[in-house]
Amino acid sequence: MFGVKEHNTTNNFSCNTITIERIEMKKLNLKILACTGILLSSSVFADGHSPVEFSANVGYFSDYIYRGGSQTADGAAIQGGFDMGHESGFYLGTWASNVDFGNSANIEIDFYGGIGGELPNGISWDIGALYYWYPGVKAADDAGGDFDFYDIYAGVGYTFGGDLAPSIGFGIAYTPDYFGEVGDATYYTVDFGVSLPGDVGLAFQFGYQDNDEENRAGPSYSHASVGISKAIGIFTLDLSYYFDIDDTKEFWVRGNDEPDALVFSVSSSF
């Protein structure tokens, strides 16, 4: 785990509702995206359907980027998950991806749950917890640290009116014992997005990984990304560029040792 968790996401979104797509954690999918959490609005259930809804998602990614760092040594990833949401705003879900940390870790399975909603002024909010599980990892391969860990996260977001429906979101995720049992870490994100004609979306994200002074994982760092997505039928195509803002993030990079990455993905939710 070279970076800090937040899953691959697409760019056509609204901070007021997680439109069933995570992977776009899109479409009720774990999209810790512009509103960094999984902003699940009760408006999803406003059409009179069952108070409980289920969804699933699957996608191919040319790389699995997590908080600015590759989780697959610059290799491709197949990812997918299942989600359940209640009209009250409560949700549960699970998500999985292949990983490559150069040891016995080859799969990541996440479990998450929380509650979110929308205030009368249109501001969306979300709080929850996310657990990262790396089954089959042997302690001898970890250099003495347990890979499994959890985040407690919160996010707020707002989507403005107009044809472009610009969105802004702020998120924070805290873990008392980060990946590898290295110490406290807090992750901050700021996201912006706009919707263009033709089911095209643009997204921009700034992230900051704040490692505690006693955190043995290395120095804190910042990163950013910009991407464009296009919905075609039941599929979403996405092209995103991830880049570092300071040199310290190179500490986290594996693979070809390049801190920047251009990632293509195709995903679907149902």
What are these regions (language model features)?
Residues 226, 230-235, 241, 256-270:
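Outer-membrane beta-barrel "beta-signal"
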Residues 47-100:
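Short glycine/proline- and aromatic-enriched beta-strand/turn motifs that initiate or cap beta-hairpins
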Residues 52, 74-78, 105-109, 146-152, ...:
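Residues that define the transmembrane beta-barrel architecture of outer-membrane proteins
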Residues 145-215, 219, 241-244:
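Detector for outer-membrane/organellar transmembrane beta-barrel domains
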Residues 54, 88-94, 121-127, 161-170, ...:
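Repeated loop/turn-to-beta-strand initiation elements of outer-membrane beta-barrel proteins
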